[in-house]
């Protein structure tokens, strides 16, 4: 599905990513965990063609993404929810979704399917998105990314600033997408927010991959203590 191999990226003369490698299989949830500024978001942006990488290879379904314009990446079946819930705040929930559906032949059918996944959004279909709660806005951002019916979904800190009840709803949505065979690569700073949904966790520190394990291995308290003591999360 997704292969990232020896990814290297510089900003000016500063190395941001240092030979990052990992694989993501169909229906798998992989979390990049690390503190702010570790390089996690740069990995997502590199996949989306928003940041150039100096060396390395990115493959999606055996197709090379390196050098592909960001405009064409979503057309290959890759959805992206950036940090900050970038919505059209002056538009309604429905209008935000319809923008995401503009290029879809079966837009109404897709919209109905998405709204059935997010009952809260269905209840607020005519509400101005800027008046939604933070959790509801995150749901809408996720729902809009699903308008292209992606095979791969990139999520940048999807639980940031959310109440526990909303975090639970976002996790349930991720698990439902996983059941449908969607692969998910997500970025988080808080380990407790993602362990219930992640199959694998990779810790990124100073642009390097320093640790990886299955979520079951990561739940081991001794392992957590060792890793957290090392990177200071």
Residue ranges and their predicted role:
Residues 128-132, 136:
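Conserved ABC ATPase signature
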Residues 120, 203-210, 216-233:
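C-terminal boundary and immediately downstream tail of ABC-type ATPase nucleotide-binding domains
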Residues 48:
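Helix-to-loop junction immediately C-terminal to a conserved catalytic motif
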Residues 145-146:
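ABC ATPase C-loop
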Residues 153-157:
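Catalytic Walker B motif of ABC-type/P-loop ATPase nucleotide-binding domains
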Residues 33-35:
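The feature captures the beta-strand-to-loop junction immediately N-terminal to the Walker
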Residues 56-65, 76, 109-110, 116:
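Conserved ABC transporter NBD signature motif
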């Amino acid at each position: 599905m997704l292969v990232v191999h020896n990814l290297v990226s510089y900003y000016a003369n500063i190395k941001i990513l240092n030979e990052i490698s990992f694989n993501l299989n169909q229906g798998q949830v992989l979390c990049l965990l690390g503190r702010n500024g570790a390089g996690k978001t740069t990995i997502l942006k590199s996949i989306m063609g928003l940041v150039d990488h100096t060396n390395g290879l990115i493959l999606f379904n055996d197709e090379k993404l390196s050098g592909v314009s960001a405009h064409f990446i979503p057309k290959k079946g890759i959805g992206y929810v950036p940090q900050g819930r970038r919505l059209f705040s002056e538009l309604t929930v429905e209008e935000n979704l319809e923008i995401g559906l503009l290029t879809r032949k079966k837009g109404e059918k897709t919209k109905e399917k998405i709204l059935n996944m997010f009952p809260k959004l269905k209840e607020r279909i005519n509400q101005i998105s800027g008046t939604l709660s933070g959790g509801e806005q995150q749901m809408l951002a996720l729902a809009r990314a699903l308008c292209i019916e992606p095979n791969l979904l990139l999520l940048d800190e999807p639980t940031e600033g959310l109440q526990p009840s909303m975090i639970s709803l976002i996790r349930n949505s991720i698990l439902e997408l996983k059941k449908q065979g969607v692969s998910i690569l997500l970025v988080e700073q808080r380990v407790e927010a993602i362990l219930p949904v992640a199959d694998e966790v990779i810790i990124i520190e100073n642009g390097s991959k320093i640790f990886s394990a299955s979520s079951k291995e990561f739940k081991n308290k001794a392992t957590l203590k060792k890793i957290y003591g090392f990177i200071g999360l």
